[in-house]
Amino acid sequence: MSLENVQEASAAEGSPAALQERLHRAGGASKQRRNLVAFKFGGSSLLGADRMLHAAGLVRAATRASNVIVVVSAMKGVTDHLLSIARTLADGELAHARRQAELVMDLHLVVLRDLQLSEDDGLRVRRELQFLGRDLLHEVPAHGSVAAGAERFDRLASFGERFSARLFAAALEKSGVPAVPVTSSDFVLTCDTFRDAQPHLEQTKQRGRDVLLPLLEAGVVSVVTGFIGATPDGRITTLGRNSSDFSGAIIAHVVDADELVIWTDVDGIYTANPNESSEARLLHELSYDEAHALAASGAKVLHAKVLPLAAETEMVVWVRNTFNPQARGTRIGSPRVPEHPATARIEKSQHGGAA
């Protein structure tokens, strides 16, 4: 499959089935490499073009040794803006809500500008963002009455990840990594408890593999939206605030990833908040039970739903610092096994090894 054809697939708008059809026409799938790692990037890791390109470099380093799939949060602060729009709508301040929505759109267009893509790629991604912006504004009418219930809340909240997935896929392609944005509501099936929906894992796995495995086999990095799913009849749901870590675990489970690496803005998991305690100590190794006990004691470890799923599937979870990638981070899992090649490759590249 040529890079030109991969880029054609990444430009496709519409259903995942359309992406798969383009990949099929492009000449079939390449042999999948043995190791598979899921990267989840938090909002602070994606705040602006420079950070996106830095994170893209981490993905690029990992792809030399492994297949990689990426799950993204919204850029830091964007979900709060979107929830503010929902509250403003509930108060009946439609004009103000619409201005807020336009500001969210403008924020992402600034990041697109700062990515400095080629003219063709820039126009393509701008068009994709404008389609999303049109859908966002459709949720925020300029006049009339608006029912601002939980279902609309979830539709509004979903736009942050949908914007960031398109931008990060563009950052990856600029870095030489073929990538496509994938909207998780196309395959993450949930109940209809809006704002805190529970995923149906088995159905999600069946549907998700149909979407994601052809892209993996073709050597394309899927950039999947965290946080969101959909009911069986297609209504967008969210998995609860700060649930993108959980989304990362779900996607890793779908593709049977060897590891889930959660990239954040700290070096790993500490015994206490290092900003509040001089005695805080970085923990390099934790069992699932130890991590669960820390979380139960109130420590900020991971989203509460990550650990049960990781333990059930014996998935190794790493917590690492996007901005200090040479730091080892914290490993959560069963007794230690030889280090995963993707992790070793990143550390080597950060110390002057092959990029």
What residue ranges belong to the model's regions?
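Nucleotide/pyrophosphate-binding catalytic subdomain
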Residues: 1-307
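Conserved ATP-utilizing enzyme core subdomain
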Residues: 163, 324-325, 329
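Alpha-helix boundary/capping detector
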Residues: 198, 317, 336-337
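A generic structural signal for well-ordered coil/turn residues at beta-strand boundaries
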Residues: 313, 326-328, 350-352
